[in-house]
Swiss-Prot record:
It holds the Pfam family OEP. This is Antibiotic efflux pump outer membrane protein ArpC. Residues 1-17 form the signal peptide. Keywords: Antibiotic resistance, Cell outer membrane, Lipoprotein, Membrane, Palmitate, Signal, Transmembrane, Transmembrane beta strand, Transport. The lineage of its organism: Bacteria, Pseudomonadati, Pseudomonadota, Gammaproteobacteria, Pseudomonadales. PROSITE patterns: PROKAR_LIPOPROTEIN. It comes from Pseudomonas putida (Arthrobacter siderocapsulatus). InterPro entries: OMF, OMP_efflux, RND_efflux_OM_lipoprot_NodT. The outer membrane component of an antibiotic efflux pump. Confers resistance to numerous structurally unrelated antibiotics such as carbenicillin, chloramphenicol, erythromycin, novobiocin, streptomycin and tetracycline. Is not involved in organic solvent efflux. One of its GO terms (biological process) is response to antibiotic. GO terms for molecular function: efflux transmembrane transporter activity. Induction: The arpABC operon was not seen to be induced by carbenicillin, chloramphenicol, erythromycin nor by hexane, toluene or p-xylene. Belongs to the outer membrane factor (OMF) (TC 1.B.17) family.
Length: 484
């Protein structure tokens, strides 16, 4: 009987080679072969290390930011959920993969029963006993048309997509922490600037008020000076609030409070980031985890079509066991007590009111939906990189122009202050110079923040943020298929 069971298993594996999964072909990328060109774009440069392979410790120069990113990778809850989802999909794949193999189980049972005389065939009451021990396979499906293999393939692709989703979550987290940190730094700089400007306005207001008391300045001059003071106080409260909210945002991203031993930050206008190469549009197909995730989900939908097709064909399941049966426990394994069971079952769909056809149509529609999602993901990635490349050059020019504007306003302010104090110009000219300088300085900080966040977003768009150190891509093995 053991040989019969073995032969049955071998036959099942041979017959299980058929698959109805459609041949998979990746859709054409619906984007241009080159990045956009024009006055807003810098010429793309090649590099030995792609942006996706550049470690975030080499990309971000600020030691405080590096410390915060490391903290977030340990404590962030979104990243923890993504890792747990990966474990869950791995377990689901292993569960589905187990259906490819017969589930062998051993069973032992025993019973004793008293039969009354009026129910006994002999007319006498008695006690009957029965003991059994069997080893067998229960309801094993012969995968003749690849239904189980299709479902296993679908579970595998879903698991692989969850691995890419975890990568996307980490890349997004690294960029989010960096952007939140730079926003915090910029708001602190704006708060400090406003604090200093408010003191200057208050000094000017007090000076104008004293001048009014001796008849030098008019009531209008006093009112204008007070307006500047109150406007600065509004900004002071605004930036004070923003700094506190920035800390709260960082705390959520970190999953814990900002470390008390946080390293000394770099100045906002220091060399904060390494420049990353754009490469070619085709590179992001292999390096963006969200694109890889979308393709794995497309492959999973393609595998589901195979399972839906297989449902049209007969399914055969086998139940078989062998063992011993005896009325006496002591003779259960004695010669002549052997027993066996072989019970095949076939299920042939005849009428189902069109549900199988509807299931197949649904699986094909789901594949078409995933094709559209895959193409949309590629288009979004292309746009994000293109936007980042346009921002790189234009922000450099804009920032330099804004620095020149600040310098011009500083010169204007010094001249206006000198002329006001010696009585050549009115207080109105001096206040105008103060406001212009304050506005230009605020804009400079805002432009620097926009430039930094744009570069961070470009690094993210190119797939950067997964590796801690440059060179890890060559050391880290690709994701392995989990074993059953």
């Amino acid at each position: 009987m053991t040989k019969s069971l073995l032969s049955l298993a071998v036959t099942a594996f041979i017959l299980g080679g058929c698959s109805l999964i459609p041949d998979y072909q990746a859709p054409e990328a619906p984007v241009a072969a080159q990045w956009p060109q024009g006055p807003a774009y810098s010429p793309t440069q090649s590099a030995d290390v792609a942006a996706a392979e550049q470690g975030w410790r080499q990309f971000f120069h600020d030691p405080a930011l590096q410390q915060l990113i490391q903290t977030s990778l340990v404590n962030n809850r979104d990243l923890r959920v993504a890792a747990l989802n990966l474990d869950a999909y791995r377990a689901q794949y292993r569960i589905q993969r187990a259906d490819l193999f017969p589930a062998v189980s051993a069973t032992g049972s025993g019973s004793r029963q008293r039969v009354p005389a009026n129910m006994s065939q002999t007319g006498e009451s008695g006690i009957t006993s029965q003991y059994s021990a069997t080893l067998g396979v229960s309801a094993y499906e012969l995968d003749l048309f690849g239904r189980v293999r299709s479902l296993t393939e679908q579970a595998l692709e879903t698991y692989l997509s969850s691995e890419q989703a975890r990568r996307s979550t980490q890349i997004a987290l690294v960029a989010s922490v960096a952007n939140a940190y730079y926003t915090w730094q910029a708001d602190q700089a704006l708060f400090k600037l406003t604090e200093e400007t408010l003191k200057t306005y208050e000094e000017s207001y007090n000076l104008t008020r004293r001048s009014n008391e001796v008849g030098v300045a008019s009531a209008l001059d006093v009112s204008q000076a007070r307006t500047a003071v109150e406007g600065a106080r509004v900004k002071y409260s605004q930036y004070q609030r923003l700094v506190a909210q920035d800390v709260n945002s960082l705390t959520v991203l970190l999953g814990t409070g900002i470390p008390a031993d946080l390293a000394k930050p770099l100045e906002l206008d220091a060399d904060q980031l390494a420049e990353v190469p754009a490469g070619l549009p085709s590179d992001i197909l292999q390096r963006r985890p969200d694109i890889q995730e979308a393709e794995h989900l497309l492959k999973a939908a393609n595998a589901n079509i195979g399972a839906a097709r297989a449902a049209f064909f007969p399914s055969i399941s086998l139940t078989a066991n062998a063992g011993s049966l005896s009325p006496d426990m002591g003779h259960l394994f004695s010669g002549g007590q052997g027993t066996w069971l072989f019970q095949p079952q076939i299920n042939l769909p005849i009428f189902n009111a069109g549900s199988l056809k509807a299931s197949l149509d649904y699986s094909k529609i789901q594949k078409d939906i995933n094709v559209a999602k895959y193409e949309k993901t590629i288009q979004t990635a292309f746009q994000e990189v293109s936007d980042g490349l346009a921002a790189r050059k234009t922000f450099e020019e804009q920032l330099q122009a804004q620095r020149d504007l600040v310098q011009a306003n500083q010169d204007y302010y010094r001249l206006a202050e000198r002329r006001y104090r010696i009585g050549i110009d009115s207080n109105l000219t001096f206040l105008d110079a103060q406001r212009n300088l304050f506005s230009a300085q605020q804009a400079l900080i805002g432009d620097r923040l926009s430039q930094l966040t744009s570069e961070v977003n470009l690094y993210k768009a190119l797939g950067g943020g997964w590796y801690e150190q440059t060179g890890q891509a060559n050391q880290q093995a690709s994701v392995e298929t989990p074993k059953g």
